[in-house]
Structure formats: structure tokens, C-alpha cells
């Protein structure tokens, strides 16, 4: 078998066999196949696409290229969640303890933030002492003991995907749906979950800008789930404006703690309850969306989700006192408001501009390895559809020096557009696939 023949086959729009895909992935991972050949193949995939079976074979080959977690002792019950990334998306911090409090084990490996999309692990590390780099043995023992574990991707999961992603980044092949879907699902399958809830974000602050592309990606990932024997649901959710109010690590942690205490922004509340419900359906704890929502809300109302969150933080050596006293979390020295020049109805709150501004003030990374400031961030005080007055606060910017504020002032000011006519708020969700 030769790599060049496989490239020609895909160039000519033919379907690749399981053996051909395995050959490519295995030999690319070991360095036998050079970057330039895989780059040519990736471009052929971008231009000509892949069948669902091909994408599944690619996913499984990439999952098998490194460590694979065996969670079979949990009897097919472990459920995982993945978000394609957004601005202010602190959902995992609330959803994981809700679902675990309902008796369903949640074992999740999360990433760090890159670009304007925040990472769950960065938010958890705003809690002093929290240990996010667990070994396989620690991951499984904590899941066994507490029914919940959230860790960084310290294992060598799907190394073929890491190598391929680095190439896609510099060869114009990032936007290929088969390659995006196999990238996400290979890591999820390698991390051992039986059921996966996918939160596919759509809009200005998301990787997928339009509903058509997001829908296609969701359908492909659900198909991979079916063909690989996993239960998968994909929820399409709105990301034109940030989720909730807080953007920035300690600020988002504070908002998640508020939600677990029964308060918090409406859009974030709906998002957490619905995603929890879908996870409970996947884990066969709830028969339908309504009963799943009821179970999730009860876990918030009776305090069991908050208790489970404390258990998680304690089990991973974090300082639990910050959950009782969120004011102990890192805080910025300055809080500077940005106000509206005119009255009217909020037409746009540009999630990308808010996310990029948060990176510029130090809350996120422009490139891998950048050091982040846990304390800084942005509180978004308006939502699309709100009626506002001139002089009303649009944002509270949390910074440690005024210069940082000045670099983002104009971008944030223009990220909100105000209409003279009433504006209809957007739906929280655009649909669900796989249910």
C-alpha cells in the first residue's frame, strides 16, 4: 500500500477503505508518511468530502493512535459533554455536578482556552490548589469514588489528531467538516465515554458561523456516534452574543457558583438545565426532555448539585472555601464601566469582539503557552432585545491597569449596536440532532 495511491483515490472522489485510512493514520503518526503527503490528502478531503463510514473509520483510527481509557467497569453509563467553544461558556462547571448529582457518572477531559474561546480547565484553576493534571489511575479512581471528575488532557489522547490539526492550521484545511468531526470525536472516543452530549455553537462567537454548517457538523458527529456504538446527541445553540454575563476565568467561576446556588442569568440557566436533561436522557436516567429538565432543576433546588461540585473541588485538592465565599476568588484591581451613548433596543452584542477583548486584557491566550490572568474579564450587562437608556452600563471591564482597558474600549463600545425599533431576542437553541 502506498500513500500516493490513497491520495490519488481521494483526489478522484473515490471512497477509501478502512484499511487505507488506518494505513494513512498509523504511518503519519509514526512519521513514515511525510507532512506534504498528508497535507495533499487533507486538501483532497476538504474539496471532495467523505462518507459517514469513511469519517467513522478515520475517527476510530485516530482514537487508536494513542492512549485509550477503559471505563467499562461503569457498565456503559459514563456520559461526557463537549462544546465546540464559545464566549462566556462556563456550562460544564454547572452541568457536570447537576448530572452527577442525579446519579450519572460524569468523566470529562477538558481543554484550555485558545483564541477567544475560553477553556474549562482555566476556569477551574482560578480555584487555589485545584489539580487538573490527573493520571489515568487517578481519573478512574475519582470517577469511581465521587461519580465526577474534570481533568485536563494530560493523557496522550489521539496524537494523530494533534499532528493533523497542526498541519490543517497551516494548509487551509481547518474548515473541512469531516476533519473537524473526526478531530472532536476521536478524542471523545479515546477518553472512554459511552454517551456524548455535543453543544455545537452557532454564530459570531463560534467556530461555526452559520446554521447550515453547524447542522452538517452536528449530523456527521451523531452519525459517527451511531456507527461507533456510542449514544450521541448534538444541540445547536446560539453564540452570536456571549452566554450569561461573565467572560473571564474567575468571573465565570463566580457565575457558575451563583447558578449552583439557584441564581444567575436566564440564558445560562436555560442552557444548563437543557444540556443536563439531554445528558440524563443519554444516560437513561430520564425518559424525555421534560422529565430530564425536572430532575436537573431539582438537583439545583435541593442543593445536591452544589454539594457535588464541592465534592469535585475537594477531591481534586481545590480550596472549597471559595465556593462558600466567591469573593475569595482572584479579583481585578479596577472595574471600569462602558456606557451607552443613546437609548433604544439592543440589536447586536458581538460575541467575537467581546471574546477578543477578553484575550487582549489577559483573560485568554493569543497563542499556546501564553500566561493568563485569572482575575481579569468582562461583565456583559445587556442582551439582544433589551430596552436601554442613554448612559446605561453596557460592560463592566475588570482589569489590573487602565492601559489594558484603553486597548479594548473602542472594540467593546462598537460591539453593541442599538436600534430605534424594538428587537426580538434570538432563541437560545436552534435545534437538536440525534434524539
Describe each model-derived feature in a short phrase.
Residues 144-193:
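Phosphate/diphosphate-binding glycine-rich loops and adjacent basic-rich segments that engage nucleotide
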Residues 87-96, 100-101, 108-109, 115-118, ...:
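Short glycine/serine/threonine-rich phosphate/pyrophosphate-binding segments
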Residues 1, 10-73:
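N-terminal glycine-rich anion-binding loops that anchor highly charged ligand groups
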Residues 5, 10, 15-18, 28, ...:
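Well-ordered secondary-structure scaffolds
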Amino acid at each position: 500500500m502506498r500513500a500516493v495511491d490513497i491520495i490519488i483515490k481521494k483526489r478522484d472522489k473515490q471512497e477509501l477503505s478502512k484499511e487505507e485510512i488506518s494505513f494513512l493514520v498509523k504511518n503519519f503518526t509514526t512519521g513514515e508518511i511525510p507532512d506534504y503527503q498528508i497535507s495533499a490528502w487533507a486538501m483532497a478531503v476538504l474539496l471532495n468530502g467523505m462518507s459517514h463510514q469513511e469519517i467513522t473509520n478515520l475517527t476510530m483510527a485516530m482514537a487508536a493512535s494513542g492512549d485509550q481509557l477503559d471505563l467499562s467497569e461503569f457498565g456503559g453509563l459514563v456520559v461526557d459533554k463537549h462544546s465546540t467553544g464559545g464566549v462566556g461558556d462556563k456550562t460544564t462547571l454547572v452541568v457536570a455536578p447537576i448530572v452527577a448529582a442525579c446519579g450519572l457518572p460524569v468523566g470529562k477531559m477538558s481543554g484550555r482556552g485558545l483564541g477567544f474561546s475560553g477553556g474549562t480547565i482555566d476556569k477551574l484553576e482560578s480555584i487555589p490548589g485545584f489539580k487538573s493534571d490527573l493520571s489515568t489511575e487517578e481519573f478512574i479512581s475519582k470517577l469511581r469514588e465521587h461519580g465526577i471528575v474534570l481533568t485536563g488532557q494530560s493523557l496522550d489522547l489521539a496524537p494523530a489528531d494533534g499532528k493533523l490539526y497542526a498541519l490543517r492550521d497551516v494548509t487551509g484545511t481547518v474548515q473541512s467538516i469531516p476533519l473537524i468531526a473526526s478531530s472532536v470525536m476521536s478524542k471523545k472516543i479515546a477518553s472512554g465515554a459511552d454517551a456524548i452530549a455535543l453543544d455545537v455553537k452557532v454564530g459570531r462567537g463560534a467556530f461555526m458561523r452559520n446554521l447550515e454548517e453547524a447542522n452538517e457538523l452536528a449530523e456527521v458527529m451523531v452519525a459517527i456516534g451511531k456507527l461507533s456504538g456510542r449514544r450521541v446527541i448534538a444541540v445547536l445553540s446560539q453564540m452570536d452574543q456571549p452566554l450569561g454575563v461573565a467572560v473571564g476565568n474567575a468571573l465565570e467561576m463566580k457565575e457558575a457558583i451563583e447558578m449552583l446556588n439557584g441564581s444567575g442569568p436566564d440564558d445560562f440557566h436555560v442552557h444548563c438545565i437543557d444540556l443536563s436533561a439531554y445528558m440524563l436522557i443519554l444516560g437513561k436516567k430520564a425518559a424525555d426532555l421534560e422529565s430530564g429538565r425536572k430532575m436537573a432543576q431539582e438537583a439545583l433546588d435541593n442543593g445536591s448539585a452544589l454539594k457535588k461540585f464541592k465534592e469535585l473541588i475537594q477531591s481534586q485538592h481545590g480550596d472549597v472555601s471559595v465556593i462558600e465565599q466567591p469573593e475569595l476568588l482572584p479579583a481585578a484591581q479596577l472595574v471600569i464601566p462602558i456606557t451607552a451613548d443613546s437609548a433604544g433596543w439592543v440589536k447586536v452584542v458581538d460575541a467575537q469582539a467581546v471574546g477578543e477583548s477578553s484575550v487582549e486584557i489577559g483573560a485568554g491566550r493569543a497563542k499556546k503557552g501564553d500566561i493568563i490572568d485569572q482575575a481579569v474579564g468582562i461583565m456583559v450587562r445587556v442582551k439582544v432585545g433589551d430596552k436601554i437608556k442613554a448612559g446605561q452600563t453596557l460592560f463592566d471591564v475588570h482589569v489590573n491597569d487602565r492601559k489594558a482597558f484603553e486597548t479594548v474600549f473602542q472594540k467593546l463600545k462598537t460591539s453593541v449596536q442599538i436600534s430605534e425599533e424594538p428587537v426580538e431576542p434570538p432563541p437560545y437553541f436552534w435545534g437538536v440532532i440525534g434524539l
